[in-house]
């Protein structure tokens, strides 16, 4: 019914916005109409910034976080603790941990979890790069800050078995419920989770 209301170009904008996480039909319609009718200059600015970013953003050669340079700000920061490596699912987890101010080591961003049903295996998560980093660096602790979902448990187990080097492997714990996503935890809960991490 709504397809008869909107022109093809407006419908195309709505459908594009619907592809974004957490954006449903109504939200995509509201956003599209706002951008096209009330604030076309904002629409142009967003489009230009996205075009510029997609042309220039890449993944850090070490941690796999998004960056404009070959090495991201955290990996190139000599004040960070090189002996600690925190393995996370996404940059949103990195943001949550950094904002909580509870960790000063380095990261490795998986950009997902092992999920055979979705066609995501170790190679998609660049675990070969992670393995090389662990082999090359003087790391004394690997912290698995992975959400306790079924896929997260599978991923954490695979990584812990993959590490043959004699180093401490820990998992954040207290306050993270099964099925919970790390990025949604408040700072106090994250602090408890890091302080109560257990050895694997």
Curated annotation (Swiss-Prot):
The keyword Zinc applies. Keywords: DNA damage, DNA recombination, DNA repair, Metal-binding, Zinc, Zinc-finger. It comes from the Bacteria. PROSITE patterns: RECR, TOPRIM. A zinc finger (C4-type) spans 60-75. SUPFAM superfamilies: Recombination protein RecR. Residues 83-177 form the Toprim domain. Disulfide bonds: none annotated. One of its GO terms (biological process) is DNA repair. GO terms for molecular function: DNA binding; zinc ion binding. InterPro entries: DNA_Rcmb_RecR, Rcmb_RecR, Rcmb_RecR_Znf, TOPRIM_dom, TOPRIM_RecR. May play a role in DNA repair. It seems to be involved in an RecBC-independent recombinational process of DNA repair. It may act with RecF and RecO. PANTHER family: RECOMBINATION PROTEIN RECR. Belongs to the RecR family. This is Recombination protein RecR. It comes from Francisella tularensis subsp. mediasiatica (strain FSC147). The gene is recR.
